[in-house]
C-alpha cells in the first residue's frame, strides 16, 4: 500500500478544522445591526462632525497651506480636551471634600481613583510633546507668522487648572509685567476670578490633614510624643559622637549632627513655620503639616494607607506639571531659540522662569523627607490606638479620647 499511512487522519483533521472555523464565523455573524434601525450612532454621540472639522489652517486661509500646521493644531486641541477631563476629575474631588463626604472612607477610594486618573493623563500629556517634536524648527517657522497674537499662555483651562489646584497668586511670575488675568477679557476673566475665590484643592486637603486622627493633645498626642522622642534621640546621638576617640571623625560627625539638630528642632517652632508660610515658602498650616508627617510615618497602618496614597498622588501631579512645563520650555527653546513668543512674551525666558517651586502646590509634602528619623524615634502606638486605627470608619478626630492615649 503506497502513500502516507496517516493521510486519512490528516484529511479528517483538516476537514474538522475547516468545519470549526465555519462554525466560529457563523457565531461571529449572529449579531444584529441596531444602528440600521435609527437612533444614536457613534459619530453623533461623539459629535465628530464638529471635532473633525475644527482644524482651520491659518496658512491655508492666507493662501499658503503649510502641511505641519495641521499637526500643531491637532496636538494643542488634544491638550485642551485632556485639560477639560482633568478639570472634570478635579472638580469632582473638590466637591467630595467640600461636602464633607471625604470623612466616609468609601468616598476616599473615589478620590484616590480620580486623582490617579489625573496622574495617568498628565503622564500622557508629558509624552505628547514627542509628537510635536517630529516637526523641525524650520517646519514651524513656515507657519508661525500666521499664529500671532495667539499664544499658549492664553489657555484658559490651564490657568483654571493652576488656580483650582492651588497655585498661589502671589507667587505667579508676571506676564509682560502684568497680572496674568489681564490677558483674558470678558467672560474668561470672570471665570478666572471666580476660580481664584473658590476653595482650592490645596486648602481642602489642608483642612482634611488638620483632622488627622491621633494629633489631639488629649488623645494619642503624636506631635508631643514625637518632639519628646526627637529630643531624646538627639541627646543620645550627641553622647555617641562625644564618645568617639578619632578627633577628625568626631569633628565631622559633630558638624553633621548640629545641622540635623537645627533642622529637626525648627520643625517644632510654630512661629517660624508661620513666618515661612507668610513668605510662601510653606503652603500647609502647622497642624496640617503635623497630619501629613503622621501619615508619612504610619503609612503602613491600615488606617493611613489610603491617605498616604492620596499624598503620593498629589506629589505625582506636582511633579508631572513641573515636567510638563519643563518639556514645554525645551520645545519652545528648540523651535524659537530666544525669540519673543507669538503672544508678545519673552518666550523661552518667561517660560523658564515658571519652572520652579513657585508653581509647586504641594511642596511641603516633598519636604517631609527632610524630617526622616530612625524608626525607633517615631512614637510607638499602644494596642488600643493600633486597634482603633484599624477599625475606625471615619477620619474624624472626635473618635479619639483621652483614655485611649498612653
UniProtKB/Swiss-Prot annotation:
What domain of life is recorded for the organism?
Answer: Eukaryota
Pathway membership, UniProt: Amino-acid degradation; L-tryptophan degradation via kynurenine pathway; L-kynurenine from L-tryptophan: step 1/2
Q: Which residues form the signal peptide?
A: none
Instruction: Give the sites modified to Phosphoserine.
Output: 19
User: Which cofactors does this gene product need?
Assistant: heme
Check the record and name the InterPro entries matching this protein.
Trp/Indoleamine_2_3_dOase-like, Trp_2_3_dOase
Q: How many and how are cofactors bound here?
A: Binds 1 heme group per subunit.
Indicate yes or no for the key word Cytoplasm. Answer: no
User: Where on this chain does heme bind?
Assistant: 328
Example GO biological process term?
A: protein homotetramerization
- Name one molecular function that GO assigns to this entry: heme binding
Reaction(s) catalysed by this chain, per the record, are: L-tryptophan + O2 = N-formyl-L-kynurenine
Q: Which residues bind substrate?
A: 72-76, 144, 342
Keywords, ordered alphabetically: Dioxygenase, Heme, Iron, Metal-binding, Oxidoreductase, Phosphoprotein, Tryptophan catabolism
Q: What is its EC number?
A: 1.13.11.11
The subunit field of the Swiss-Prot or TrEMBL record says: Homotetramer. Dimer of dimers.
Function summary: Heme-dependent dioxygenase that catalyzes the oxidative cleavage of the L-tryptophan (L-Trp) pyrrole ring and converts L-tryptophan to N-formyl-L-kynurenine. Catalyzes the oxidative cleavage of the indole moiety.
Q: Would you identify the family this protein belongs to, as annotated? A: Belongs to the tryptophan 2,3-dioxygenase family.
Q: What is this protein called?
A: Tryptophan 2,3-dioxygenase
Organism the protein comes from: Mus musculus (Mouse)
Q: State the gene name recorded for this protein.
A: Tdo2
